[in-house]
Amino acid sequence: MPEIYVYAVEGRSLDQKRGLVQDITAAVVKNFNVDAASVMVQIVESSKDNKAKGGVLFSER
């Protein structure tokens, strides 16, 4: 069972998340030759106060 984790800052809509997991699932099905039902995708969100890039919090960008 392939498991894919997506780490992202919170703020995406449910429609955006739905589209992402559908696209990821389709790519795994195509490239790994597995059934869609066996593909697990988990979106792990963090607040902008808890994530930084280049030493700058996303909430301060």
Regions found by a protein language model. Name each.
Residues 2-61:
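A domain-level signal for the structural core that forms small-molecule/cofactor-binding pockets
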